[in-house]
């Protein structure tokens, strides 16, 4: 059972350094029960919790090639999206939604699994490359810009975890119990700072998340 953390409205003047507020939150993953518990679906896991926190629910929107949830936070519209195009075609869904709502890349936050961070670690980043993550690569092509925000949820790398698996196999398998607990803890930390990101205060969100990484 998912624990719900209802967001409270936060006044914009509570934040000192502001970026563009986030209006589209995209959780990356693969659709269907075969993939539900796999590491590659960490973005879906967080998106599901955020829908609960924002008191909304996902529904299929075929025209957007994904599951969509609409919410209000601090008087503003927020859209949550889980593409059902499979990871490699995520941009088809993200591009369609961003175009319809006339959103700039800077107003988009993508939640995704990150091989270069260990389970229990998380980082916020804007722009940059895709580091071989095909979902990010396709979104960058669809938006015509790398300047969207990313919330990188650490899942570890087979090499860093002492496993002999190939990366393609690793991301399509569930984490072990200890790793899952570490990822779940990170997801709760992310949920706690999403209100700041929705208000555009990525400086606060970054301090809170990166400071708790212990790195």
UniProtKB/Swiss-Prot annotation:
It is an enzyme of class 3 (hydrolase). Keywords: Cytoplasm, Hydrolase, RNA-binding, tRNA-binding. It is found in: Cytoplasm. PROSITE patterns: PEPT_TRNA_HYDROL_1, PEPT_TRNA_HYDROL_2. GO terms for molecular function: peptidyl-tRNA hydrolase activity; tRNA binding. Monomer. Hydrolyzes ribosome-free peptidyl-tRNAs (with 1 or more amino acids incorporated), which drop off the ribosome during protein synthesis, or as a result of ribosome stalling. HAMAP family: Pept_tRNA_hydro_bact. This is Peptidyl-tRNA hydrolase. It comes from Bordetella pertussis (strain Tohama I / ATCC BAA-589 / NCTC 13251). The gene is pth.
